[in-house]
């Protein structure tokens, strides 16, 4: 079935995503704005297991220039959203007027960036977005922040933003989502995330400290994520732009677009939950099992 088959390289999206990469002025620079310590290679963990050998004695993030991070408007407004969600699916979310205002402030901030302007222009050309910025903002709000139910018979308990950027749990036993480096860093700092090691690519014995797409293994509040994937250092608007473009240019339930961005050949995977984003993440193509994400 087309929706689950790996496609050939999408040259059009590769070109667009490299434009977005080059336009990402808010991206944090490896070795200067942050430092990571990859340490050991993670071991195999069967799906559903919460036991993992720890191949990393220290946190992944050795240093992040938080002053610089929080001085950049899109990062600052993004960070303010991270504590607005209930971790467990099956527990109805309650969205306050203050949280709605924070969501809108974040969208206003990213819509001012070159990255989102390029993505918006592309989607307008593809007839997938209206030219009006306000219309596009409303479209983004629906796609990313509209609540829906992941657990049958339950009230609205999730949204695309929560799953992808914040992370959530399934019955307190399984980590779902959490594909964002800022949330990973902040949870590491609170000692709720324990980095277990990197998951290597077949064509590269180990990642480099300046790699900006990584496959990781970690535990979060006693649950283990056997493989989690994340961009490192990129701005929130960069990820929003990538995933929104893939979501709006495909009607499939599961879309895997193969792209080359900088040195990284990867799939951008986006799962559709009706009119909303279910999940979205990058997969380095040499990873053995993309379905563990």
UniProtKB/Swiss-Prot annotation:
<feature type="active site">
    <location>
        <position position="163"/>
    </location>
</feature>
<feature type="active site">
    <location>
        <position position="179"/>
    </location>
</feature>
<comment type="subunit">
    <text>Monomer.</text>
</comment>
<protein>
    <recommendedName>
        <fullName>Poly(U)-specific endoribonuclease</fullName>
        <ecNumber>4.6.1.-</ecNumber>
    </recommendedName>
</protein>
<dbReference type="GO" id="GO:0003723">
    <property type="term" value="F:RNA binding"/>
</dbReference>
<dbReference type="GO" id="GO:0016829">
    <property type="term" value="F:lyase activity"/>
</dbReference>
<keyword id="KW-0694">RNA-binding</keyword>
<keyword id="KW-0464">Manganese</keyword>
<dbReference type="GO" id="GO:0005634">
    <property type="term" value="C:nucleus"/>
</dbReference>
<dbReference type="GO" id="GO:0046872">
    <property type="term" value="F:metal ion binding"/>
</dbReference>
<keyword id="KW-0378">Hydrolase</keyword>
<feature type="domain" description="EndoU">
    <location>
        <begin position="9"/>
        <end position="286"/>
    </location>
</feature>
<dbReference type="Pfam" id="PF09412">
    <property type="entry name" value="XendoU"/>
</dbReference>
<dbReference type="InterPro" id="IPR018998">
    <property type="entry name" value="EndoU_C"/>
</dbReference>
<comment type="function">
    <text>Poly(U)-specific endoribonuclease involved in the processing of intron-encoded box C/D snoRNAs, such as U16 and U86. Releases products that have 2',3'-cyclic phosphate termini at the 3'-end.</text>
</comment>
<dbReference type="GO" id="GO:0004521">
    <property type="term" value="F:RNA endonuclease activity"/>
</dbReference>
<dbReference type="InterPro" id="IPR039787">
    <property type="entry name" value="ENDOU"/>
</dbReference>
<keyword id="KW-0540">Nuclease</keyword>
<comment type="similarity">
    <text>Belongs to the ENDOU family.</text>
</comment>
<keyword id="KW-0255">Endonuclease</keyword>
<keyword id="KW-0456">Lyase</keyword>
<keyword id="KW-0539">Nucleus</keyword>
<dbReference type="InterPro" id="IPR037227">
    <property type="entry name" value="EndoU-like"/>
</dbReference>
<keyword id="KW-0479">Metal-binding</keyword>
<feature type="active site">
    <location>
        <position position="225"/>
    </location>
</feature>
